Amino acid sequence: PTIILMFGDHQPSVEQEFLDKAYGVTQDQMTMEQYMGKYKTPFLIWANYDLPDDEIPTTSLNFLGQYLLSYAGIENSLYENYLQNFQEVLPAMTFVGYIDQNGKAYSHLEQNEYTTLIEDYRTLAYDNLFGGHSRHAQYYQAPQ
């Protein structure tokens, strides 16, 4: 069996004047939803076996691996379970901001009910990527 995930990591660069006309507002007048929309890119998961016909809702790059593991039938680590639960509350998160389960977009500069949740996520993601010897490996390993 083969499964492939393809995605774009950014939209092509275009002049700001073009974007202002396309959105009908200048960048400083955009809503957070419009601003985050500038960074949307398509993705595709393909396999040489049947995949569920489920439509994947709004998501972000940091969560695509969850779908890939699920479709491949691979059991989650504790960290991946955490990401799955996190995504139910905040289904998309980028360097610009994040979107909650109701579709409302927020800037990372805002302090709100999600601030602590995001700080916890960042701590765990940092530990996973850069924890070195202090990394809590058992949290990130796939079950045996």
Q: What does each model-identified segment do?
A:
Residues P1-Q144:
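Solvent-exposed soluble domains appended to multi-pass membrane proteins
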